[in-house]
Amino acid sequence: MAVTITRSGVLSLGADAVVLALEMTGSAAACPAGEELLRTGGEKLAAALNEAKFVAVGHAAELPESGLPAAHLLLTATPRYLTGKANELLILGRCYEAVFSLAEKLCCRSIALPFLSTFYYRFPQSEAVEIARRAAEKTPLEVFLCAETDALCNLARQPYQKPQIVSYFGYYRDYAVFTLSNGLFARVDLRPERVFADVVPYVEACYQRGNDPAQPPLPEAEIARLRRIYEESGL
């Protein structure tokens, strides 16, 4: 279904459902979209939030009697980006999957939400935007992704720039790792029968080149083959 990137507020688009991001503590996230919803919903929304059941990070729930003009208010608890070692990017993707799945179950045809965790949660902006766009493209809903700053809106409207490999990092067991231009890592499967690559926010020290003396170094030709797998992947 259609995906629209806009600078508009989530309530101005007439969507069947809107999304309120929550802190991990359960309180509304202090971001422009959250402030818009709290301001419009007033005391009724504040009271409903106080009575709401806990929503786990990466999950979603509907909040009835919200006092908002939208038919459905959906809640999702979003992750903070700390070190990248807690699967933050994966969990952020699950937040989108959860709210879209719930909206479909509620028979919604459209949904408006901010780019989750991008306002002050320290997420790598390009990756957070791409996670949102990819998730939105998979749902049959009409999705309005509402950027909370001009800079984020401009970034989100640009084609995704695939991070470039900077250097070979090392390998361990079945995977080789390359450092990327955005500070993340490309992980590529060494097994010839599996053509697989993905992007991960961190790697363990065991992948560092030369960490294991019993692990022979990869030939340069093999490193070049693995590099091509990443470059030709759809990441």
Regions found by a protein language model. Give the residues of each.
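A short acidic, often aromatic-flanked loop/helix-cap motif at beta-alpha or helix-coil junctions
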Residues: 10-15, 151-153, 195
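Mixed-charge, Lys/Arg-enriched low-complexity segments
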Residues: 200-235
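Acidic, low-complexity, intrinsically disordered interaction modules
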Residues: 172-175, 179-213
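Short hydrophobic-acidic sequence motifs that mark active-site Asp/Glu residues
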Residues: 18, 73, 112, 185-187
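Secondary-structure boundary/capping motif
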Residues: 71, 108-110, 140, 173, ...
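Phosphate/ribose-phosphate-bearing ligand recognition and processing surfaces
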Residues: 80-163
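Glycine-/small-residue-enriched capping loops at alpha/beta junctions
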Residues: 1-106
